[in-house]
């Protein structure tokens, strides 16, 4: 197993957003519809960027050691698919599906930013696109795929696990520890108590993804899971990642 040490700066990064909106893309005025062929070309281009990257090789190597079953996935806040960030994050999700043998019919997307072209594109690939936001709940064998969502949305979903059974928590999203490290304890406890509790009580282990060059799509992305024994122990050199700030889209 790769052990990754996080070097943290003293710079504070406030989690913005009072309410849990879920889109991770700035969509104001983004109302143009795109053809399915164009969306596919954009996705293909993004998948090419990932295909031979060291980033993907590292992610595949590390996640392939995860032994707990994952049967379903909820994908929140992807954003408009024509954007580079969303197409890259969707490309990574396809790779994660391969690693865990996830079937499209067990993967549900929700983002209020989606327009009919996005919905059609995802449904044509066999995914479920939810018309309404899913109710946060403690879900067994379910991956939450939430790159760069607002802190308030992480807080809302974490509450379901903290108040029920944290052992079922599996999430691919921002490195939660950075929210705790970059805010005074009193502030994080009052604003995001479940993020604080999840981190300080060691309810989960996190695996930090490596840096991806030139684009913002995967900044501070981590795989969070409860049981450290889920990974096969391997003696390998430590890796260092500079995670000085938390990537988060405006809410």
From Swiss-Prot:
Q: Which UniProt keywords apply?
A: Cytoplasm, Nucleus
Q: Which family does it belong to?
A: Belongs to the SRR1 family.
Record-level GO cellular component terms: cytoplasm; cytosol; nucleus
Pfam families xrefs:
SRR1 (PF07985)
Where is it located?
Cytoplasm; Nucleus
| One GO term (biological process) | DNA damage response
Chain segments annotated as transmembrane: none
The lineage is: Eukaryota, Fungi, Dikarya, Ascomycota, Taphrinomycotina
Q: What is this protein called?
A: SRR1-like protein
Query: Looking at the record's lineage, which domain of life comes first?
Result: Eukaryota
Q: List the disulfide bonds.
A: none
**InterPro entries reported for this sequence:** SRR1-like (IPR012942), SRR1L (IPR040044)
Where's it mainly located? cytoplasm
Signal peptide (UniProt feature, chain positions) = none
């Amino acid at each position: 197993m790769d052990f990754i040490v996080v070097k943290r700066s003293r710079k504070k990064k406030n989690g913005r957003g009072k309410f849990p909106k879920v889109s991770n893309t700035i969509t104001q005025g983004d109302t143009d519809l795109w053809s399915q062929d164009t969306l596919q070309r954009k996705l293909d281009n993004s998948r090419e960027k990932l295909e031979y990257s060291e980033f993907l090789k590292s992610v595949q190597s590390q996640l392939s050691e995860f032994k707990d079953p994952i049967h379903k996935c909820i994908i929140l806040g992807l954003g408009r698919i024509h954007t580079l960030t969303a197409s890259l994050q969707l490309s990574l999700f396809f790779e994660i599906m391969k690693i865990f043998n996830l079937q499209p019919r067990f993967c549900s997307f929700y983002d209020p930013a989606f327009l009919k072209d996005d919905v059609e594109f995802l449904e044509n690939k066999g995914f479920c696109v939810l018309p309404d936001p899913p109710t946060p709940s403690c879900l067994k064998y379910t991956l939450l795929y939430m790159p760069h969502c607002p802190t308030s949305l992480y807080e809302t979903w974490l509450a379901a696990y903290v108040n029920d059974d944290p052992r079922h928590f599996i999430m691919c999203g921002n490195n939660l520890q950075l929210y705790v490290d970059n805010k005074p304890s009193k502030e994080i406890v009052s604003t995001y108590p479940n993020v604080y509790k999840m981190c300080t009580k060691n309810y989960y282990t996190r695996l930090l993804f490596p840096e991806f060059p030139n684009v913002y799509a995967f900044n501070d992305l981590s795989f969070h899971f409860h049981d450290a024994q889920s990974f096969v122990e391997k003696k390998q050199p430590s890796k260092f990642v500079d995670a000085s700030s938390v990537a988060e889209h405006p809410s």
